[in-house]
Swiss-Prot record:
Keyword Cytoplasm part of the UniProt annotation: yes
GO MF entries: nickel cation binding; unfolded protein binding
Keywords, in A-Z order: Chaperone, Cytoplasm, Nickel
Family: Belongs to the UreE family.
GO biological process: protein folding; protein-containing complex assembly; urea metabolic process
Species in which this protein is naturally found: Pseudomonas putida (strain W619)
Gene this protein is translated from: ureE
Protein name per its UniProtKB record: Urease accessory protein UreE
Cellular component per GO, a single term: cytoplasm
Role of this protein: Involved in urease metallocenter assembly. Binds nickel. Probably functions as a nickel donor during metallocenter assembly.
Span list, region Disordered: 133-161
Pfam families: UreE_C (PF05194), UreE_N (PF02814)
UniProt-annotated location(s): Cytoplasm
Length: 161
């Protein structure tokens, strides 16, 4: 089995591709089947959403695999009115919905309840199959810490009454 342990920026040779939905692309440890049928394991650092087009390599750099974002069931809102689109983004964000944001477009994993809510705001919602690339904040794909320059060797738990 190929073990992919690191992300790389570029490579002259791509030895395979793997097509993954967003739920698989948020995992740092995962057994996958490459598009050519070979087995591979992802052993990556945590806290990073894999994006379509990213390159993964094994420790030696002899295997380089391109990640492809799989088409999946999504709801897409297209709107030329920025105020209406901002209202939709506000209501979806208030519900902590992972959201793909592009000029004139919002996309989220298909949910008929959310579709109906947005239609109630006057937006047209289309259910479709498309790659889903949500904003990084939904999955903390940037380094994140709660550190503030000193350690807490022990955590005090609240007393139970």
């Amino acid at each position: 089995m190929i073990v992919l342990t690191r992300r790389i920026d570029e490579s002259d040779t791509i030895t395979g591709t793997v097509t993954l939905d967003v739920d698989s692309r948020i995992k740092s440890r995962l057994r996958v089947t490459l598009d050519d049928g070979r087995e591979a394991g992802l052993m990556l650092e945590r806290g990073h959403l894999l994006r379509g087009g990213e390159l993964l390599a094994d420790a030696a750099g002899s295997q380089v695999v391109r990640v492809l974002a799989a088409p999946e069931a999504v709801s897409t809102v297209r709107c030329s009115d920025p105020h209406l689109l901002a209202r939709a983004a506000y209501h979806l964000g208030n519900r902590h919905v992972p959201l793909q944001i592009q000029p004139g477009l919002l996309r989220y994993q298909h949910d008929h309840v959310l579709d109906d809510m947005l239609r109630g705001l006057g937006l047209a919602v289309e259910a479709e199959q498309a790659p889903f690339e949500p904003e990084a904040g939904a999955y903390q794909s940037a380094p994140h810490s709660h550190s503030h320059a000193h350690d807490h060797p022990f955590v005090r738990l609240p007393a139970h009454s």
